[in-house]
């Protein structure tokens, strides 16, 4: 009987010692926070640029919810390696170095995810071009190393590698190769002149002509740092 009581006391003491350790481990987890920024997902690799401070984080997604949200946000014309605007709940596990390894975001939940536009992106860009008949748009961003072309007419997207433009007078010309098919080249000519997209009452300061092979698209453009077009 004495042995039984002694064994019971030992088990109780062990249990009391284990529970605080478990609680302490849980208390060391980073708090859950809300992060707003630009999320990029490509072939299972995901990263996040924080709009609050510009920090670049890798993402760990145990919820497995990012691929579906990301694909939906990119529609109707997904470009390879494009970023989307996202608000997420996550724990930030800090890395070893603020510059080279700022940390990892462990996703808890996706609050929202939507397509990128000139109003919501916080990654620097040079031009945003758009046209109608069919509807299309192109974002030009040295920071994202690409020209992202969305053709809503046939619901296709292409990413062209960024290269320095050539400027002459009021004309700026980009020549870029398709990231997925380098034999395909895009030539994009931007001219500083009044432009209308033909459908809305918006007035732009730049006209745009895009050539890919034998196909040509015409439209208007917005330059970063200049006022967003308004109706006359």
What is each of the regions a protein language model found here?
Residues 13-15:
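C-terminal motif of bacterial Sec signal peptides marking the signal peptidase cleavage site
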Residues 29-49, 90:
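Structural detector for short beta-strands of small beta-barrel domains
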Residues 46-67:
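OB-fold (S1/OB) nucleic-acid-binding surfaces
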Residues 35-38, 43, 116-137:
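Tryptophan-anchored aromatic micro-motifs
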Residues 93-120:
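OB-fold/S1-family single-stranded nucleic acid-binding modules
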Residues 17-19:
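Bacterial signal peptide processing site
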Residues 37, 75-103:
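Flexible glycine-rich surface loops and low-complexity tracts that mediate binding to linear polymers
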Residues 56-62, 136-189:
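Central antiparallel beta-sheet cores of small beta-barrel/beta-sandwich binding domains
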């Amino acid at each position: 009987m004495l042995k039984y009581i002694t064994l019971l006391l030992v088990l109780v003491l062990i249990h009391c010692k284990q529970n605080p350790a478990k609680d302490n481990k849980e208390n060391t987890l980073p708090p859950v926070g809300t992060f707003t920024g630009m999320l990029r997902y490509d072939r299972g690799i995901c990263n996040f640029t924080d709009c609050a401070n510009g920090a670049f984080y890798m993402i760990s997604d145990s919820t497995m919810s990012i691929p579906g949200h990301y694909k939906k946000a990119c529609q109707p014309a997904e470009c390879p390696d494009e970023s989307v605007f996202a608000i997420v709940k996550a724990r930030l596990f800090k890395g070893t170095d603020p510059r080279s390894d700022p940390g990892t975001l462990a996703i808890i939940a996706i609050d929202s995810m939507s397509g990128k536009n000139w109003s919501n992106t916080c990654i620097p860009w040079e031009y945003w071009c758009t046209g109608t008949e069919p509807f299309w748009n192109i974002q030009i961003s040295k920071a994202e190393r690409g020209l992202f072309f969305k053709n809503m007419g046939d619901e296709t997207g292409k990413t062209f590698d960024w290269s320095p433009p050539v400027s002459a007078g009021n004309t700026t010309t980009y020549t870029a190769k398709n990231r997925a098919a380098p034999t395909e080249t895009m030539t994009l000519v931007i001219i500083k002149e009044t432009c209308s997209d033909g459908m809305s009452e918006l007035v732009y300061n730049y006209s745009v002509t895009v050539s890919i092979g034998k196909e040509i698209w015409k439209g208007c453009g917005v330059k970063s740092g200049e006022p967003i077009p308004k109706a006359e």
